[in-house]
């Protein structure tokens, strides 16, 4: 067998593997660097970041990158965006780690 071919196929399979998270009956594509769901600054990303840093549940997101674009608060978010934030928060609560402030 051609080891280069095997290596290439293995790499392709790893890249093709999708990661999903289901929360409150909704399944989210959380494939890093491939899914709009986990884009930096989006509701899912902000929820997971708030959980990671030990912050309170406070739905928000950024139109673009975090800190470099307009911040949208809960009152301006759609119900779907609030659910996406909540899913990100819960995702990190279940599978993520927490910032070591130590």
Where are these regions (language model features)?
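Intrinsic-disorder/low-complexity detector
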Residues: 2-102
């Amino acid at each position: 067998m051609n080891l280069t071919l095997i290596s290439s196929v293995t790499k392709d399979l790893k890249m093709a593997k999708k990661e999903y998270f289901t929360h409150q009956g909704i399944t989210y594509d959380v494939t890093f660097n491939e899914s709009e769901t986990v884009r930096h600054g989006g509701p899912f990303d902000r929820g997971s970041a708030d959980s990671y840093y030990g912050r309170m549940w406070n739905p928000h997101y950024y139109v673009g990158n975090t800190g470099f674009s307009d911040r949208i608060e809960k009152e301006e978010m759609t119900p779907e965006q609030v659910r996406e934030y909540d899913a990100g928060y819960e995702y990190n609560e279940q599978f993520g780690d927490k910032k070591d402030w130590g």
